[in-house]
């Protein structure tokens, strides 16, 4: 998964976010000028926002490129009353006017959703309007298609998480992982049960 990190600089934020829900938004705008840096600047400087920086955690462009917004462990600024323990995902486009989501954008969402599910476990997906006083993500946003997008399981060398717990993969190709043992990882001892989950 290629997530482009532009190294945005933020003001003070509450770093106690524990992602358990995804909330999707439309930007209500599109075009080359709507970069992640432009949104970040707008959220920091325009009077109706005045946030520490971009309120979203991820931004998906129409061309399928995915940009990092605020850190996952930072409480968002994207859905009043529902910013804690959520991740805000913004889609470029005005889905009140735009009638179809480009394949590139939808496919990027599927990749991002898979990445986040593999990192945090299964999380419900909501449109902004379902959790806040808003019409976002727009009348024509394919919310059910986005909500029900298939997730591809993936593994990485190192720590992985699924619905049962955390486990440590040592070989992705052969699916080797620690189990029924104590292991020293990054200077810390961890105990793994017979199924490979950290205790």
Please place each PLM-identified region on the residue numbering.
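Glycine-/small-residue-enriched capping loops at alpha/beta junctions
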Residues: 47-54, 62-63
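Basic/polar, cationic surfaces and motifs that engage anionic cell-wall
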Residues: 1-27, 62-66, 71-72, 82-87, ...
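Short secondary-structure junctions
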Residues: 1-6, 47-49, 161
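Extracellular adhesion/carbohydrate-binding repeat motifs centered on closely spaced tryptophans
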Residues: 153-199
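Active-site acidic/histidine clusters and adjacent loop/turn architecture
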Residues: 16-44
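Glycine-rich phosphate/pyrophosphate-binding beta-alpha loops
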Residues: 75-77
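Short loop/turn microsegments at loop-to-beta-strand junctions
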Residues: 54-55, 187
């Amino acid at each position: 998964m290629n997530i482009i990190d532009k190294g945005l600089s933020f003001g003070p934020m509450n770093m106690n976010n524990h992602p358990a829900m995804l909330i999707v938004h439309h930007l209500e705008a599109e075009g080359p000028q709507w970069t992640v840096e432009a949104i970040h600047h707008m959220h920091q400087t325009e009077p109706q926002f005045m946030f520490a920086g971009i309120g979203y955690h991820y931004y998906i462009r129409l061309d399928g490129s995915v940009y990092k917004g605020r850190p996952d462990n930072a409480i968002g600024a994207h859905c009043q009353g529902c910013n804690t323990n959520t991740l805000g995902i913004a889609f470029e486009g005005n889905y009140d006017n735009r009638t179809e989501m480009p394949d590139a954008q939808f496919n990027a969402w599927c990749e991002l959703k898979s990445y986040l599910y593999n990192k945090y476990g299964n999380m419900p997906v909501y449109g902004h309007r379902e959790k806040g006083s808003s019409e976002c993500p727009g009348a024509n946003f394919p919310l059910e298609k986005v909500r029900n997008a298939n997730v591809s399981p993936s593994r990485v060398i190192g720590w992985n998480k699924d619905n049962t717990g955390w486990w440590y993969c040592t070989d992705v190709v052969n699916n080797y992982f620690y189990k029924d043992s104590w292991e020293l990882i990054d200077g810390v001892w961890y105990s793994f049960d017979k199924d490979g989950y950290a205790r």
